[in-house]
């Protein structure tokens, strides 16, 4: 497995960077292609990520024809044949997001067998909200030998209230409801931009989805869906990561194609911290002077709150802001593992239950560290930019799940960073 080596201490980032299509959007979009019994579905602006390759394999394993043109960032899916009911364990077990094929398979076939999902080990991440919602739509569910088995002679509309606005559950239920009899109403639904993007695709395929982006989504079932062409929304988390990178290096970076509206919670905290954030025609510009950075208090919340997927990167930014900052993680448990690695670099921090206290403005030293999950890997690399000396980040399998060419983009902005091959025993 490769490693990333950062020469820290003088890495002011300057220039522009272009953002990819959203990883958190494209995975459910790929699952939705299963619903099209007529015509091909073409997804454009698809990021080249390991998770995308896995989801392509999951969809292909269901007897759909999948063609990924990496050079064109385009995926074509033909799901007009007979869709199989079982999502292959060897693929589903690798990635948590693959559970979103459950709803589409049920809608197309009436029965499904899907392995319990894998992926990042962040907290318990239960899938009970997915299952409770499907049961309300007439699905009978059993769990045996690591598999979820679900059957429904015919899905019917239901009024579903979710105890928590789960993104994955909202997506699964939306897709299942598109071909159900009657009307489905999802209350306390997730409101993320990726939910809106999925609704746009489904409607382009002939579905009747209203209210995406609000707390209440209404889906009126239709007889069938057809293929279409759809452009994947830009990745707000990648955009946010580069906004933080510019801020913590005292840089001046234009993040091309970044959407201001999608990044409002992050932008609000950057402004509060003393960072200059400007909306431009081509994207979002971030300028920073390190001596102006102030400590802040941040709490992660479901959208439109501060995104949990930016928590690790923002704690990296807190290390260079003078004073004591706090980060409260309310969405996932056990998501401060990266701070243990940062302590190897000299970070002064304390974790009490769901709250991390970060003492910023202290000198950091480069060290060998291991990424513990996707966003932690980015946070450790960013911390390496501002630490004195050399930082080596291992376990890049996490990074490759959600960032395309991350080190190359940083290098183009002026970072002293490279990716090297490493022997397995070095990990």
Swiss-Prot record:
Major enzyme class: transferase
EC number annotated for this UniProt entry: 2.5.1.7
Cytoplasm listed as a keyword: yes
Residues with PTM 2-(S-cysteinyl)pyruvic acid O-phosphothioketal: 120
Cited InterPro entries: Enolpyruvate_Tfrase_dom, Enolpyruvate_Tfrase_sf, MurA_subfamily, RNA3'P_cycl/enolpyr_Trfase_a/b, UDP_GlcNAc_COvinyl_MurA
Xref: Gene3D superfamilies: Enolpyruvate transferase domain
CC per GO annotation: cytoplasm
Entries under CDD domains matching the protein: UdpNAET
GO MF term (any one): UDP-N-acetylglucosamine 1-carboxyvinyltransferase activity
Domain of life (superkingdom): Bacteria
A Pfam family the protein falls into: EPSP_synthase
Pathway(s) of this molecule: Cell wall biogenesis; peptidoglycan biosynthesis
Location of the protein in the cell: Cytoplasm
Broad class of where this protein is predominantly found: cytoplasm
Keyword annotations of the record: Cell cycle, Cell division, Cell shape, Cell wall biogenesis/degradation, Cytoplasm, Peptidoglycan synthesis, Pyruvate, Transferase
Chain positions recorded as phosphoenolpyruvate binding sites: 23-24
GO biological process, one term: cell wall organization
Keyword Cytoplasm set for record: yes
Residues forming the catalytic site: 120
Record field: catalytic activity: phosphoenolpyruvate + UDP-N-acetyl-alpha-D-glucosamine = UDP-N-acetyl-3-O-(1-carboxyvinyl)-alpha-D-glucosamine + phosphate
Residues annotated for UDP-N-acetyl-alpha-D-glucosamine binding in this entry: 96, 125-129, 309, 331
NCBIfam families associated with the record: murA (TIGR01072), PRK09369.1 (NF006873)
Function noted in UniProt: Cell wall formation. Adds enolpyruvyl to UDP-N-acetylglucosamine.
Family indicated by similarity: Belongs to the EPSP synthase family. MurA subfamily.
Protein name (record): UDP-N-acetylglucosamine 1-carboxyvinyltransferase 1
Organism of derivation: Streptococcus pneumoniae (strain ATCC BAA-255 / R6)
Lineage: Bacteria, Bacillati, Bacillota, Bacilli, Lactobacillales
């Amino acid at each position: 497995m490769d490693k990333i080596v950062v020469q820290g201490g003088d890495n002011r980032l300057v220039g522009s960077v272009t953002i990819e299509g959203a990883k958190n959007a494209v995975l459910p979009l790929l699952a939705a292609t299963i619903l099209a019994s007529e015509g091909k579905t073409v997804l454009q602006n698809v990021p080249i990520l390991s998770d995308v390759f896995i989801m392509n394999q999951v969809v292909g394993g269901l007897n759909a024809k999948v063609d990924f043109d990496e050079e064109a960032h385009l995926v074509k899916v033909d799901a007009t044949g007979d869709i199989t009911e079982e999502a292959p364990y060897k693929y589903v077990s690798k990635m948590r997001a693959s559970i979103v094929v459950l709803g589409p398979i049920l809608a197309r076939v009436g029965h499904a067998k899907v392995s319990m999902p894998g992926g990042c080990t962040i907290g318990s991440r239960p899938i009970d909200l997915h299952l409770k919602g499907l049961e309300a739509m007439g699905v009978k569910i059993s769990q045996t030998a690591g598999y979820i088995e679900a059957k429904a002679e015919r899905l019917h509309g239901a009024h579903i209230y979710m105890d928590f606005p789960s993104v994955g559950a909202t997506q699964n239920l939306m897709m299942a409801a598109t071909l159900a009899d009657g009307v489905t109403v999802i209350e306390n639904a997730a409101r993320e931009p990726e939910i809106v993007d999925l609704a746009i695709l489904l409607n382009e395929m002939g579905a009747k989805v209203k209210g995406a982006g609000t707390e209440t989504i209404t889906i009126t079932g239709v007889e069938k869906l057809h293929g279409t062409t759809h452009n994947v929304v830009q990745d707000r988390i990648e955009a946010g990561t580069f906004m933080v990178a510019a801020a913590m290096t005292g840089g001046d970076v234009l993040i091309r194609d970044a959407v201001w509206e999608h990044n409002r919670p992050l932008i609000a905290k950057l402004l509060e911290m003393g960072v200059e954030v400007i909306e431009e025609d081509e994207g979002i510009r971030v300028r920073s002077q390190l001596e102006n950075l102030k400590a802040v208090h941040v709490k992660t919340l479901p959208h439109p709150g501060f995104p949990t997927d930016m928590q690790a990167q923002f704690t990296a930014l807190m290390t260079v802001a003078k004073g004591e900052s706090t980060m409260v993680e309310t969405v996932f448990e056990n998501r401060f593992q990266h701070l243990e690695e940062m302590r190897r670099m000299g970070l002064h921090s304390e974790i009490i239950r769901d709250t991390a206290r970060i003492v910023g403005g202290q000198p950091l030293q480069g060290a060998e560290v291991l990424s513990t999950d996707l966003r932690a890997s980015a946070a450790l690399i960013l911390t390496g930019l501002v630490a004195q000396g050399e930082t080596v980040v291992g376990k890049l399998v996490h990074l490759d799940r959600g960032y395309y060419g991350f080190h190359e983009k940083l290098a183009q902005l002026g970072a002293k960073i490279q990716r090297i091959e490493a022997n397995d025993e070095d990990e």
